[in-house]
């Protein structure tokens, strides 16, 4: 297992630690239609967001290694002379931005800041389905959450599984459900 922690893995960990464990163990969920759609529209959506935000310039699909974090930022936008990461989501903007989306953005902030050697206080999430942009600012509580998730993921990458914590609302449609055994399968209910 790699010791590089991708911001997507941080997002997944905060949504469901067991799913992050399976991904880190080399068993990623097969791409869903939404995932495939997201990849297809990523460049076009990032360009639309850059234009909407008035970016002076934009770099697309930027791979950054800033241990323990590494991954590919959908775009790095230069706004008012400062770099800001942009994450593209295929979905519509939710009423409240989920904390796992904010933590993923925080990880990109940390990576871009380290890679570019410039202070980065803001990340953007472009929700392509609705064409809306969320601005995520790095705050102390978000930094603490990021540090916590990175610490837990480092333990997972060293082979320590997370504590099982079933959530029926999340587990019901989860691809990893067959391995977690949080919920009985349909056959077991009969």
Curated annotation (Swiss-Prot):
Gene3D superfamilies noted in UniProt: 3.90.320.10
What does the entry list as the binding residues for [4Fe-4S] cluster? 16, 171, 174, 180
Report the EC code(s) recorded for this entry: 3.1.12.1
Locate the transmembrane regions by residue number.
none
Cofactor, free-text remark: Mg(2+) or Mn(2+) required for ssDNA cleavage activity. Can also utilise Cu(2+).
Q: Does the keyword Oxidoreductase apply?
A: no
Name the positions where Mn(2+) binds. 74, 87-88
Report the domain of life of the source organism.
Archaea
Give the protein's biological function. CRISPR (clustered regularly interspaced short palindromic repeat) is an adaptive immune system that provides protection against mobile genetic elements (viruses, transposable elements and conjugative plasmids). CRISPR clusters contain sequences complementary to antecedent mobile elements and target invading nucleic acids. CRISPR clusters are transcribed and processed into CRISPR RNA (crRNA). This may be a 5' to 3' ssDNA exonuclease.
Stated family = Belongs to the CRISPR-associated exonuclease Cas4 family.
Q: How does it assemble?
A: Can form a Cascis complex with Cas1/2 and Csa1.
Name listed for the protein in its UniProt record: CRISPR-associated exonuclease Cas4
Which organism is this entry from? Thermoproteus tenax (strain ATCC 35583 / DSM 2078 / JCM 9277 / NBRC 100435 / Kra 1)
Its encoding gene is what? cas4
């Amino acid at each position: 297992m790699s010791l590089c922690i991708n911001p997507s893995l941080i997002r997944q960990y905060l949504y469901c630690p067991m799913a992050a464990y399976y991904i880190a163990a080399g068993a990623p969920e097969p791409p869903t239609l939404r995932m495939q759609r997201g990849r297809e529209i990523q460049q076009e959506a990032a360009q639309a967001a850059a234009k909407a935000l008035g970016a002076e310039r934009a770099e697309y699909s930027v791979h950054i290694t800033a241990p323990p974090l590494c991954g590919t930022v959908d775009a790095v936008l230069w706004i008012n002379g400062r770099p800001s990461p942009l994450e593209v989501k295929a979905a519509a903007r939710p009423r409240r931005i989920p904390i796992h989306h904010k933590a993923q953005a925080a990880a990109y902030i940390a990576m871009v800041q380290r890679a570019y050697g410039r202070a980065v206080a803001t990340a953007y999430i472009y929700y392509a389905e609705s064409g809306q942009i969320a601005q995520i600012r790095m705050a102390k509580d978000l930094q603490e959450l990021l540090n916590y998730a990175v610490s837990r993921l480092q333990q997972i990458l060293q082979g320590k599984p997370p504590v099982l914590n079933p959530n029926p609302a999340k587990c019901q449609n989860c691809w990893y459900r067959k391995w977690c055994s949080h919920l009985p399968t349909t056959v077991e209910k009969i």
